[in-house]
């Protein structure tokens, strides 16, 4: 089980990223646009710097939905490897069978 503080920190980052995503995209479009003037770009960069760092989607960490484990994460299932194995053994994931030889 992951530390609750780390899981909550990641939840906070996801919430902030969602909140500022539209504003962030607008500012990045102005910065990358060849039609915008130098002053507009500079002003957009300053506004982008005012957005909290945790609002950046890059700072998010994929975590297991059950245990919060950050490593061994399978995107397709949203689970860490050990939770995925446990769920597969119990037959909780349709169509997934563990191989044995």
Swiss-Prot record:
- Biological processes per GO annotation: translation
Q: What would be one Gene Ontology cellular-component term for the protein?
A: small ribosomal subunit
**A GO molecular function held by the record:** structural constituent of ribosome
According to the UniProt entry, which residue ranges have a biased composition of type Basic and acidic residues? 1-10
Reading the lineage from the top rank, the first entry is Bacteria
**Region Disordered: start and end of each range?**
1-20
UniProt KW keywords: Ribonucleoprotein, Ribosomal protein, RNA-binding, rRNA-binding
- Is NADP there in the keyword field? no
Family as reported in the entry's similarity comment: Belongs to the universal ribosomal protein uS14 family.
Q: What does this protein do?
A: Binds 16S rRNA, required for the assembly of 30S particles and may also be responsible for determining the conformation of the 16S rRNA at the A site.
Quaternary structure note: Part of the 30S ribosomal subunit. Contacts proteins S3 and S10.
Q: What is this protein called?
A: Small ribosomal subunit protein uS14
- What species was this sequence derived from? Halorhodospira halophila (strain DSM 244 / SL1)
């Amino acid at each position: 089980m992951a530390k609750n503080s780390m899981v909550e920190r990641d939840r906070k980052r996801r919430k902030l990223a969602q909140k500022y995503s539209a504003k962030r995209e607008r500012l990045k479009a102005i910065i990358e646009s060849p039609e915008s003037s130098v002053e507009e770009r500079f002003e957009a960069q300053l506004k982008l710097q005012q957005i909290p760092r945790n609002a950046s989607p890059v700072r998010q960490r994929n975590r297991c939905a059950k245990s919060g484990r950050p490593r061994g994460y399978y995107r397709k299932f949203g689970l860490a490897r050990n939770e995925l194995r446990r769920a597969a053994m119990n037959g909780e994931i349709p169509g997934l069978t563990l191989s044995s030889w």
